[in-house]
Amino acid sequence: MSILTTVLVTFFAGMGAGLGTGFAGMSAAAVISPMLITFLGVEPYMAVGIALSSDVLASAVSAYTYHKNKNLDIKNGLIMMASVLLFTVIGSYAASLVPSATMGGFSVFMTFLLGVKFILRPVMTTKETMAQVDAKKRAVQSLVCGAMIGMICGFIGAGGGMMMLLTLTSVMGYELKTAVGTSVFIMTFTALTGAVSHFAIGGLPDTLTWALCVVFTLLWARIAAVFANRAQPKTLNRATGVVLVVLGIAVMGFQLLA
């Protein structure tokens, strides 16, 4: 495999993953994994490990950008994160007991549908509306929704970022920027946990592919997060929707190729 091919594939994979992360808190695994498997012949387990490790820094830099612009709910984010991590383990164990069925297509299709939703029905909640919710109620919501997301993610092994964004905006009534900021904050830690366990079990991947994916994803996530925090709500909804629809269609295409 030529170095040029590796650079091109990782650049576009990182671009898709970074834009998805910075705009919508989407997991890099949804974009990077299928591209590495389809075009570079990377073994699936390794591809997911590379994608998760690319997610860590991209989510961290996005979370920092959202936090700097006061678009991050750390307190409830921590409650939800603990709940998500615990129930992901329970969900993974439950999945190991039933006949294996790959559900990767589910999260990609969900990405596409969520994109359509943001374009047609933008999230126009304001911070003032969010502030009216009782703190205790918000904490309970974070706990329950985190458990639900973790259980689904652990069971089907995908879809965390999109599940979180959908839950935060539709169920918990978060304003879009705060929802994405909180989602990428949680994902920094869930991706780190996933990446470490992947590499502990499967060993380290090809250094060049790995490094390029991490750098390109980080770069594009930073660009997307800066733009997202400056944009007006309606513009942001449309931009997020377009990014998700395009990524959803592209990844469905890669899955057909594979």
Residue map of PLM features:
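Transmembrane helix boundary and interhelical junction motifs in multipass membrane proteins
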Residues: 23-32, 157-167
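Short, structured loop/turn "capping" segments at alpha-beta junctions
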Residues: 126-127, 143, 158-163, 174-178
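Transmembrane helix-bundle signature of multi-pass membrane transporters/permeases
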Residues: 18, 48-56, 180-191, 244
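Hydrophobic, membrane-facing alpha-helical anchors
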Residues: 1-6, 10, 53-64, 159-168, ...
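A small-residue-rich subset of transmembrane alpha-helices
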Residues: 54, 182-199, 208-221
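Membrane-interface alpha-helices at helix entry/exit sites of multi-pass transporters
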Residues: 42-50, 75-76, 173-184
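Juxtamembrane transmembrane-helix boundary motif
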Residues: 1-19, 33-39, 44, 65-151, ...
